[in-house]
Amino acid sequence: MGEYIVTKTLNNNVVVCTNNDQEVILIGKGIGFNKKEGMALNDQTITIEKIYKLESEQQKAHYKSLVEIADDNVLQVIIDSLNFISNTAMNVDSKQLVVSLTDHIIFAYKRLKQNQVISNPFVMETMQLYSDAYHIAKQVIDQLNAALDVHFPEDEIGFIALHIASNTEDLSMHEMTLINNVIKKGIDIIESDLVTTVDKESLQYQRFIRHVQFLIRRLRRKEYIHAQDDFVSMIKNHYPICYNTAYKILTMIQKQFDVNISESEIIYLTLHIHHFEERINQS
């Protein structure tokens, strides 16, 4: 790994160093204790848990400012969480996650201590769409609760799952939130048109949200599907209510993501909505 020259000690667990003219952040328990600017470090004399090379000056400045406002105990718990996530089977971009997750947990903890809880309306959608990330996020929250002697609400599992998933999916946090929002509004339309309450544990719900997720991805890549004309006519005639509902949902998606919607897309979404209708008729 070579030699690291300390340029700044952020706290007992984090130091900023240079290595071959590259500024890096070293993280490890007690790594910054009594370390002064100009001191030389190497992995023989200290235990380095993580090395981060933050690419942009904005990332570096933001991370440094975060570390400076967090106490050592909170930061160590965050470091442990990052290590835990990195050691899972998910292919996480640690350089991106270290900044976003540190930022999120520091301020979520501060809000919790001040009894300010932000609700997450997309917990169920996140759980279904990104189940692996959600499972890991739940374990992270359990660790945070135990280490910090607090009780983060389930909303936070959803938020952290999105941070994790955005580092493994080809979507940004913003895009993932938009998709969750579209799915939630779509379910609202279905519940209104079919006069029902959708069971969010049902197979129909899981299939619907998966379909919408991949539908949006395809449309953004300009990948379109085509159904035969006679099939389109048959579905429109057989399931007019479901077709009308699908049309409303896809019109919303069209406006939200500025994409083109074909008649075939409406037909295939109609079939998914019909599954909800069938479930209602069976109950």
UniProtKB/Swiss-Prot annotation:
What's one GO MF term for it? RNA binding
Q: Which residues form the PRD domain?
A: 69-173, 174-283
In the record, the note on similarity to other proteins reads: Belongs to the transcriptional antiterminator BglG family. GlcT subfamily.
One GO term under biological process is: positive regulation of DNA-templated transcription
Keywords from UniProt, A to Z, are: Repeat
Stated name of the protein: Protein GlcT
Q: Does the keyword Nucleotide-binding apply?
A: no
InterPro entries attached to this UniProt entry? BglG_antiterminators (IPR050661), CAT_RNA-bd_dom (IPR004341), CAT_RNA-bd_dom_sf (IPR036650), PRD (IPR011608), PRD_sf (IPR036634), Transcrpt_antitermin_CS (IPR001550)
What Pfam families does this protein's entry cite? CAT_RBD (PF03123), PRD (PF00874)
